[in-house]
């Protein structure tokens, strides 16, 4: 199966709902909402890190496989938006059913992240790029994606420090650090 725009977007919907089916029908428990929240964030991160890293990996490695993935970079971003919108619904459900409250930092920091994500989503067409101008579009998308990656980095680094060094969070943090290093090196050379 070829990686197409439709396949990417459909996968974000399919995997988001597959998580719900798994946690609530296949292996239901008192922790289902918490686990669904956690794993929907993991799913979102995979789409985000792909969208974030493809251009620098294409420039650095120039491999056919990466070049082919980079063609659909916009759709990795839109798939992130879909899966992270499901994550937002899951978070609301979790806080509603658990009677826990999110912290003010999570509300403000996460809220800003969602605003930026939706602004990027709404401007992810060629027509919108023309309408708002390439320079404005580039500023919005550069600030937006970097902010989102920083939020994930902060969250994962905190989970890594609070848990085991041998966790998936360590892999995520290292992946972000590697991509940042490649971007800094490219910037320094230009």
Question: Residue ranges of each PLM-predicted region?
Answer:
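Membrane-embedded alpha-helical bundles that constitute the cytochrome b-like, heme-associated redox core
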Residues: 1-190
């Amino acid at each position: 199966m070829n990686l197409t725009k439709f396949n990417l977007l459909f996968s974000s919907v399919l995997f988001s709902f597959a998580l719900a089916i798994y946690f609530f029908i296949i292996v239901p428990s008192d922790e289902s909402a918490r686990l669904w929240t956690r794993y929907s964030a993991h799913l979102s991160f995979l789409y985000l890190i792909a969208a974030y890293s493809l251009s620098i990996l294409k420039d650095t490695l120039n491999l056919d496989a990466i070049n082919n993935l980079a063609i659909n970079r916009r759709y990795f971003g839109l798939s992130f938006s879909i899966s992270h919108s499901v994550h937002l619904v899951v978070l609301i459900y979790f806080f509603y059913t658990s009677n826990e409250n999110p912290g003010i930092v999570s509300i403000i920091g996460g809220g800003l992240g969602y605003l930026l994500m939706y602004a990027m989503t709404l401007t992810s067409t060629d027509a919108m790029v023309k309408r708002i101008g390439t320079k404005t579009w580039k500023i919005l998308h550069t600030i937006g994606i970097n902010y989102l990656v920083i939020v994930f980095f902060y969250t994962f680094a905190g989970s890594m420090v609070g848990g085991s060094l041998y966790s998936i969070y360590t892999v995520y943090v290292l992946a972000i650090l590697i991509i940042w290093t490649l971007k800094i090196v490219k910037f320094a050379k230009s």
